[in-house]
């Protein structure tokens, strides 16, 4: 049994139902809601225009229905007596002089005047609807720019360790779907506002006509609300599952595209296709279920008003004691109002459905914008000026995960300014971890890294990173020109500076052979260049920075012998009188290093010059003999 089902209580319930989503952005402390509030404060004029146009639209519609009702009353009035007695409607409160003028007016001109007034009111309503859509469109565009900026800033603000824990597909989904989710929410809330005002306008018209009509309309609204309470939670749950499935599929496709070379090389194309096909079937099943649930809303919203019309028509006839002429204006106006209210109810039902479908995307937006569970780049600290004495590792340890074995364990060494220090060891020994610590990508879990006896943890990290030059085996180039890639991070560089850096990196020759020279676009990740050419562009970028510390992380490991020779020549010319950390792939490239560290299982097991380590005849000497034997076998 439904308790307290009076018209006033039903109206209050309906008002709370519509007002809830409208007030949520102003009450919630979630990041997306705070973003909407912040933008609303900045763009309050647009919101005022949106609210004002919504009110005018609702008023125009209500006034139109009132005019149509009066016109129908005029048509049904008896030929004798007053043409139209406005005194019969004390609840409206027509002024006395207006009542007298209308009562004495000729029937035909008065009827035509009422029709003209109805048309003017509908024109005003259309203008208000236009202003409403423009204002919400402008506001949504501003919010989309804000959320795109925030998401991009948030991803860049994460520490490298935290950001690398996300899948590429997840980050792309955050950046792509977050703005869309905000736009959907704003548009839906605007539609909920204007259609909610119109809904209450129609209910007010029905109340003025007869409380019985209002009871019928309120009962219809209650039935639709009950149906929505059954369907919307299922739609919301399905939306969340659908979003998770879409993200998984997008991540898998992204990985397949990025790993095409591996899939081709290992003959795993069919296996990858089967995996994606299975995920697509899962996604299709979820989409079908979501379609069934979503599609059920609109038919139900269409059937119930028709049932209400039949019931209320019978009630109206009973209320007027069977006098058809008395009931026709009220019934005709009611049917028109209910038909138009039905359209608004369908829109409102669709709005709630879209908000439910959009809830998972909003949750993901809140997830990336919320600081909870995230580690951010370190800001602040003492600005780094220049390297004066050198770099010292003091009992440094590093664990990538709390429960994982340490990548580095008690590492200590000194790299004086102007010296070259080389790291050698088997794959996974911890060499690149040392470079990652120096570049600030990770923070040590134990010990200290001292830059001129200043703890790196207390330095302003960007000022330190801007004085580094890094050339790694995995060179990243932007889809831009060669000149832009070389000058990346060096906004002060002139064209001549870029050309000089390219020449010192042994890149001027192949650049001159390109049709557009330095203005040649390299393609995504530099796919239009060979591996050796990409490495030389990366080296040119490092040279242009004039770094205090040059880090070479197996910079020639993936190159053929000719490309390696060119890159190695450029490196040897540039590294003179510089502080250099080299992670060596071929030991022959580091024989002139001032100090060589042999790393095994995260520890330094040997250190010394090339000659000293060969003389000891232990780990380094064994690596040297192995590599020398392989090279002789290949050449033989």
Where are these regions (language model features)?
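Juxtamembrane loop-to-helix connectors within ABC transporter transmembrane domains
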Residues: 39-40, 136, 156-201, 258
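An intracellular "coupling" helix at the cytosolic face of ABC transporter transmembrane type-1 domains
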Residues: 41-45, 160-161, 177-189, 237-245, ...
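Cytosolic ends of transmembrane helices, especially the final helix of ABC transmembrane type-1 domains
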Residues: 268, 292-295, 340-368
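Hydrophobic alpha-helical segments in the permease module
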Residues: 118-125, 129, 221-222, 294-305, ...
